[in-house]
Amino acid sequence: MAEAVFRAPKRKRRVYESYESPLPIPFGQDQGPRKEFRIFQAEMISNNVVVRGTEDMEQLYGKGYFGKGILSRSRPNFTIANPTLAARWKGVQTDMPIITSEKYQHRVEWARDFLRRQGHDESTVQKILTDYTEPLELPCREEKEETPQHEPLSSKADSSLEGRVEKDELPVTPGGAGQSDDLPGLGTHSDCLQEGPGHATLAAASPSSHNGHVAEDPEVLPQETLVPQGGLWPEASSQAAGEKRAAHEYVLIEEELCGAQEEEAAAASDEKLLKRKKLVCRRNPYRIFEYLQLSLEEAFFLAYALGCLSIYYEKEPLTIVKLWQAFTAVQPTFRTTYMAYHYFRSKGWVPKVGLKYGTDLLLYRKGPPFYHASYSVIIELLDDNYEGSLRRPFSWKSLAALSRVSGNVSKELMLCYLIKPSTMTAEDMETPECMKRIQVQEVILSRWVSSRERSDQDEL
């Protein structure tokens, strides 16, 4: 057997973020005051481990690239804002996301279906949505001192912002195209939009109540009814609890001005088209929350190896032994895959799921934003006599096919053998202490090409 040759990881051509110090040790490169050791919180829901807190999500992914946003490719940065509209309305100073009228109507239809499934009749559903999605006066907000040359946001009867291109342009802040957040300062002035308590009447939740008209329907509905849960309420941390209390999310919808003709709009330039549009402030009837989903191996590594994650099930914290047993019940191969995950993480690699390329793990240097995966890993658990039931018994044909797939994507195929003593029983595997007796052997599989080997011999 020839000795494997180490190949340097292949760096990505474009890197769009800086490397942060990994958990749990804060390095000197982090700016700001030195923070104390932090315990993150997660929940086990439907055999999945999820993190809801916004700050916890950012820290876990940014410092070690743990987990994945359920609505994003990797980093949880989902937003409903339209970047094209944000650039078009760059003169508007707002933290609210700007979306198209079509996207807003999709959310109205989702909310309509949600209310129908709750058993409401069509007239009640229509009344709820009509009151809830009426145009709103712009909430009060303090003007920033660094931009005194611009006019404050005006609130008119039509509750809209007219497009201003040539003069009186309104300033813009980066929040318009970024993550959509609730408006700051709500409830601080008497003439601002007021947020209700945990349960509010339709009159309190309806825009008409702010204009001096009280809705006639006295029915009391929870805010979760008015704002259906597309994801989960972010309630795992104090900051996320504050996000839950802010029951409504406000959006700006780009709508046509009255009297604008489709033929004229199609032939008009962008500047003229913007003059025929307006921004209307409305409530978002169907909010979608993104959370960070951790694999079972990532969750256990954070809880067991780093000790920086507390996992709850039905509001009860789970011990390390209970986590080991619960994850094994959910995923029978968890013990084997976690031992390999723990080993490679301890070596400084960032392991990710390798299902895309038919393997158990992919190994990244630093993280996926910086390097391509170097190795595709197959994991097997054997005894010290190299005997045992294989998780994936390969034939020469299937092994050659997997090797060819890994080679075509510039990755090396690694066979990771976890060797346990022959005296280790099933009872010994019931706790993570069994890992102290496990040995690891790595075998890199490479395809032998006769023509290439012949040319190498001729050169020698």
Swiss-Prot record:
The chemistry this enzyme catalyses reads: pretRNA = a 3'-half-tRNA molecule with a 5'-OH end + a 5'-half-tRNA molecule with a 2',3'-cyclic phosphate end + an intron with a 2',3'-cyclic phosphate and a 5'-hydroxyl terminus
Active-site feature positions:
Y364, H372, K411
Its subcellular locations are: Nucleus; Nucleus, Nucleolus
Here the segments flagged for biased composition (Basic and acidic residues) are 159-170
Q: Gene3D superfamilies of this UniProt entry? A: 3.40.1350.10
Its BP terms in the Gene Ontology are: mRNA processing; tRNA splicing, via endonucleolytic cleavage and ligation
Q: Where is this region: Disordered?
A: 143-215
A GO molecular function for this record? lyase activity
An example of a Gene Ontology cellular component annotation for this protein is:
nucleolus
Question: What keywords appear on the UniProt entry?
Answer: Lyase, mRNA processing, Nucleus, Phosphoprotein, tRNA processing
Q: Does the UniProt entry include the keyword tRNA processing?
A: yes
EC number(s) from the headed UniProt entry: 4.6.1.16
The family line of this record is: Belongs to the tRNA-intron endonuclease family.
**Function according to Swiss-Prot or TrEMBL:** Constitutes one of the two catalytic subunit of the tRNA-splicing endonuclease complex, a complex responsible for identification and cleavage of the splice sites in pre-tRNA. It cleaves pre-tRNA at the 5'- and 3'-splice sites to release the intron. The products are an intron and two tRNA half-molecules bearing 2',3'-cyclic phosphate and 5'-OH termini. There are no conserved sequences at the splice sites, but the intron is invariably located at the same site in the gene, placing the splice sites an invariant distance from the constant structural features of the tRNA body.
Stated name of the protein? tRNA-splicing endonuclease subunit Sen2
User: What gene does the UniProt entry assign to this protein?
Assistant: Tsen2
